[in-house]
């Protein structure tokens, strides 16, 4: 059973999905797992505004996934709810972040995000994962009040757990060793901004180039205030790997 169908059964808002040609546009077309196919971020997501664009996008996407996901495009703010569930699917940790910028700016991975707290989002994300008897780490992606997808793995914005001083990683280690872990709501700092500086700089410049000056200038301002996602005191290996991959392998 699909995540989309289960969310509908639980009364959780989700975008409309289409099995064939959409009845209305715009729609988002994406493979079920773009990373599995080795796709770059810009190639994991496409928006069709009419039938001609849809046909062209489907022809391209079906090279990787014979039945890509076709969803109604939801506009508005994007957010993620990161959860840790124990062996009995009990809630052991939760952390919310909102997207501040992304790249490509038309729709792509987050380059800057900010921690916040939303009890309703956490409840809905947990209800969905618990219904599948899920255990472990996952990030549930929202757009406005709709759940878009579930990433049942360590996700790109995972460093926010450290930036916002969330105990999720510690709880994971304790639970894995059979220790007793108790969930406490809002057990992390809110209002913490975190960025991937190279990707975020490119995003800020792209906003400026697109005429979205306010967003672009805010991005340049965050260069001095937001926490760097991959900076670790005394260990530069992660940052060097990130720079190498960003500069030479994309």
Predicted regions: what they are:
Residues 49-108, 113-132, 143-147:
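Phosphate-binding site of ATP-dependent enzymes
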Residues 116-142, 152-206:
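Active-site "cap" helix and flanking loop/linker of ATP-utilizing ligase/carboxylase catalytic domains
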Residues 36, 101-105, 109-112, 151-164:
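Glycine-rich phosphate/pyrophosphate-binding beta-alpha loops
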Residues 26, 78-82, 137-139:
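Broad gene-expression machinery/nucleic-acid interaction feature
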Residues 170, 174-250:
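Peripheral (often C-terminal) accessory segments that flank ATP-dependent C-N-forming ligase machineries
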Residues 1-68, 75, 87-90, 119:
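Active-site nucleotide/adenylate-binding loops and adjacent lid/helix of ATP-dependent enzymes
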